[in-house]
Amino acid sequence: MGRFWLRKRGFWALFLLFCGLFAFSRPQAAVPAEGEALIEAPLVALTFDDGPRRSTTADLLDGLQERGVPATFFLIGEQIEGTEDLIKRMEEEGHQIGIHSYEHRWLTALSAADFARQVDRERQLLYEILGREDFLLRPPYGGVDAAVEKRANTPIVLWSVDPEDWKELDADRVTQRILENVEDGDVILLHDIYPTSVEAALRVVDTLHEKGFLFVTVSELARQKGIELENGKVYRGFRG
């Protein structure tokens, strides 16, 4: 009886050890909460423009959820109606949401009134869905000038890695361009309206996880790098 009990206890000890090792090998499970200790690992932020589009954005959210990865979505205002459930899902699953203008307009070419219709109108729509107004701004085409900076009333986020996924709809090429250029602190630009971009994004996540990278939202990336985001200031990335 004693030997059997020892063997049984030994079996369960090995089983629990195996489970523990397996758990540590899994992809990241959560985004660090504000105030938590800084992460000692290379960090990047995945960002997606021009959504939401129901088919592709939903697939992307599924893939990110499976991997425990947060991203930042810069939405087009006129595409919000009918996709409110996706936006709520983004919020619930730990993603960050930003403004990409109501109609994807060059903000540098607009009067103050037209700027408000493009940016403040979308901010109001998001407020009605999420109950808050603190959204980052990414101007379409990366178009920024002094007037945009003055009118933004929020931090302006561009990017530091652009695989031009809109130009060549090829998941292999998009993945390659990102992996050849990405570094700790980068903000990666993609578009969640293309199936090839969704595929490339998830490949990039899997490959960079294997290399020890972790993924965070734009605001969390800035915090981890010791940068306080300021209204009207332009940020392209957070490399050291």
What residue ranges belong to the model's regions?
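Active-site beta->alpha N-cap acidic-glycine motif
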Residues: 30-121, 125, 133
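Catalytic domains of cell-wall/extracellular-matrix polysaccharide-remodeling enzymes
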Residues: 59, 105-214, 219-234
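Terminal accessory/targeting
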Residues: 1-46, 58, 62-72, 183-240
